[in-house]
């Protein structure tokens, strides 16, 4: 694997290989022993958009592996403020680091960067397009908490139009056997047509709903997303749909599903849900560390000597 840009670039076997490696990384983390698996290697985190969990978990993952981190997050103090292009920025930084994690507001930015980089590029989100490392940690969470991915029933709730985590995960789940998907959203925020057409072509069972009350009782995973205000071209459209769904304690109690959320949370899950056994979103966030350790290790090892 040269880069990790989109879930469409990797198959089911490679996904399972990464998940297996992540389990080993989690076990190594639990020993509390310092690791030297990537000693002498440097990760560059290049973020053109805000991030807390993704950037910090990648930086933590690299340091846990014994590597070092350089970072570019304050665009005002970088050459980007002077008008430097993404291509030139990547060309320069790829001479400093062994691997780059990139987040950019433009769809296709990570793919473009990979064409000019001397080192592996990991896409940490390109607009509303893809977020493959979030998808891999989501799959890992499902595997760890449910015990399987094949045969699950999962409901996606909220912003399905602009939610890049949803787009990536839906595609990845379509590679597994007998997965059923439910899409709960306002009409304005339904899943993009190209993704729907892909599911139809693969004969994946899916159902579009507008109410949580329409979901079956045997759902395994409730995947909740925030309404992404920053993606709306018209603020008035955001006002129409904000707060469309709120997961309340009384709705969750007694249910068999686990609740996942890519975070940050705004108001779509009440805080008093957090202590219920179904709430797995903070554990999901933690799982990002062993998963990203596995990704960093694989990409650097796969590209050594090329």
From Swiss-Prot:
GO terms for molecular function: amino acid binding; aspartate carbamoyltransferase activity. Carbamoyl phosphate binds at residues 53-54, 103, 131, 134, 263-264. The keyword Nucleotide-binding does not apply. It is an enzyme of class 2 (transferase). It comes from the Archaea. Catalyzes the condensation of carbamoyl phosphate and aspartate to form carbamoyl aspartate and inorganic phosphate, the committed step in the de novo pyrimidine nucleotide biosynthesis pathway. Heterododecamer (2C3:3R2) of six catalytic PyrB chains organized as two trimers (C3), and six regulatory PyrI chains organized as three dimers (R2). Its EC number is 2.1.3.2. L-aspartate binds at residues 82, 164, 226. Keywords: Pyrimidine biosynthesis, Transferase. This is Aspartate carbamoyltransferase catalytic subunit. HAMAP family: Asp_carb_tr. The gene is pyrB. It comes from Methanocaldococcus jannaschii (strain ATCC 43067 / DSM 2661 / JAL-1 / JCM 10045 / NBRC 100440) (Methanococcus jannaschii). It catalyses: carbamoyl phosphate + L-aspartate = N-carbamoyl-L-aspartate + phosphate + H(+). PROSITE patterns: CARBAMOYLTRANSFERASE. Pathway: Pyrimidine metabolism; UMP biosynthesis via de novo pathway; (S)-dihydroorotate from bicarbonate: step 2/3. GO terms for biological process: 'de novo' pyrimidine nucleobase biosynthetic process; 'de novo' UMP biosynthetic process; glutamine metabolic process. Belongs to the aspartate/ornithine carbamoyltransferase superfamily. ATCase family. One of its GO terms (cellular component) is cytoplasm.
